[in-house]
């Protein structure tokens, strides 16, 4: 149980219109995206509190706020992570344990690369054209108008895992290229 840093980064998503989503889709999104982190936190948080040091970090998504109509169950599961993390942080009051959520924007992950390739093939376009269309049509609020790199998100996680971030607890930290448009 000597875990100092827990990063809850597992996640699945299935893009379907609401009318096509099954209860199984909803259950799967919550089981993997939320409940895996709940179970791991339940297991490791008591020991972190006992040792008076630890970091629990959840990875959410901009979809928790910018909800696409074809990702409802995914988006709701990610919004639940934000709420759970905020509440869990309250249990660490007076300790050197922190619980925070990283909220990345559209990131060029393996899943995003596959999406770009499949869409390019289906629409007879280049991956660059598909990406440009995505940021013009779907995520036009992005101020950087590109996918975040995995390294950009990982560097944020590294910071919030470190003692340097000891003053931040219970936060949802955006790494979204400005896509959410909030000043807070």
Language-model features, listed with the residues they occupy:
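Substrate-binding pocket helix/loop in short-chain dehydrogenase/reductase
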Residues: 17-18, 25-30, 138
